[in-house]
């Protein structure tokens, strides 16, 4: 297997160093001289701009300058023109409208420039309540009117005629005011309530009724048992039982 021969390269030609701080920039010029390397001639570096008054120090990086907040001096006034949403400046005292001078009234949206109707704006429709709300308000108003009539002198009674107002006499301590009397309405309403008899009966009954029925049933059953067993436990029945036991024994 043949080995590959490595090519021998001679020593590299050293590159002459350029001037210190020569960096090709937009203001630099590249010139070449015969039998020599190109030389970069850069313009003198411009001095950095002085930091603004009250701004961040020049040692801060660009990122820190964007996020660093330096308090402004109290003498600087904010310019309202820099803010688009700022309110308009207040007018001068002589330009302010006075109370005597009438303010110009803006025409309604449906009026034209001459005061007539503007065909571009349709006339506004009158406000109308929904049907259900109107019905509810009407029923409520009628109910309140009936309540007023009932409180005044009974339901269905005609309203008393309006009497001219008489001057009120001042009450003296010698004549005490008459106490108010209770007036009953001459119109009486009777409302019949229809209920199920079984539901009313069950409502009248309760746990006490069930316990009373159980006690009565227990007494009745005890009396029936005493009527059957009572004669067997009397003195005569005991004597007969003892005489039967004292007799001759039963033969097997």
From Swiss-Prot:
Residues 179-192 are annotated as: Binding to PP1CA. Residues 1-17 are annotated as: Required for nucleolar localization. Residues 165-179 have a biased composition (Low complexity). GO terms for molecular function: protein serine/threonine phosphatase inhibitor activity. Residues 1-129, 150-179 are annotated as: Disordered. Residues 162-179 are annotated as: 6 X 3 AA tandem repeats of A-T-P. A motif (Nuclear export signal) lies at residues 129-138. Residues 179-192 are annotated as: Interaction with host PPP1CA. Residues 222-237 are annotated as: Interaction with host EIF2S1/EIF-2ALPHA. ICP34.5 is detected as early as 3 hpi prior to viral replication but reaches maximal levels late in infection. ICP34.5 gene is therefore classified as gamma-1 or leaky late gene. The phosphatase activity of the ICP34.5-PP1 complex toward EIF2S1 is specifically inhibited by Salubrinal, which inhibits viral replication. The triplet repeats region may play a role in modulating virus egress. This is Neurovirulence factor ICP34.5. It comes from Human herpesvirus 1 (strain CVG-2) (HHV-1).
């Amino acid at each position: 297997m043949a080995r590959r021969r490595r090519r021998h390269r001679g020593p590299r030609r050293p590159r002459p160093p350029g001037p210190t701080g020569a960096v090709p920039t937009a203001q630099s010029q590249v010139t070449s001289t015969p039998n020599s390397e190109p030389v970069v001639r850069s313009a003198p570096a411009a001095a950095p701009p002085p930091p603004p008054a009250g701004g961040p120090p020049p040692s801060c990086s660009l990122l820190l300058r964007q996020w660093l907040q330096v308090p402004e001096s109290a003498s600087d006034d904010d310019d309202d023109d820099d803010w688009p949403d700022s309110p308009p400046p207040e007018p001068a005292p002589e330009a302010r409208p006075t109370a005597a001078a009438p303010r110009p009234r803006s025409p309604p949206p449906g009026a034209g420039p001459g005061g007539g109707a503007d065909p571009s704006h349709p006339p506004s429709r009158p406000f109308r309540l929904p049907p259900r709300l109107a019905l509810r308000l009407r029923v409520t108003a009628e109910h309140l009117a009936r309540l007023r009539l009932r409180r005044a002198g009974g339901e269905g009674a005609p309203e008393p005629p309006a009497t001219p107002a008489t001057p009120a006499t001042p009450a003296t301590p010698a004549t005490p005011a008459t106490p108010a009397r209770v007036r009953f309405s001459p119109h009486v309403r009777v409302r019949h309530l229809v209920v199920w008899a079984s539901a009313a009966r069950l409502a009248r009954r309760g746990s006490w009724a069930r316990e009373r029925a159980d006690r009565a049933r227990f007494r009745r059953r005890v009396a029936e048992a005493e009527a059957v067993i009572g004669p067997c436990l009397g003195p005569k029945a005991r004597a007969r039982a003892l005489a039967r036991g004292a007799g001759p024994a039963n033969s097997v």
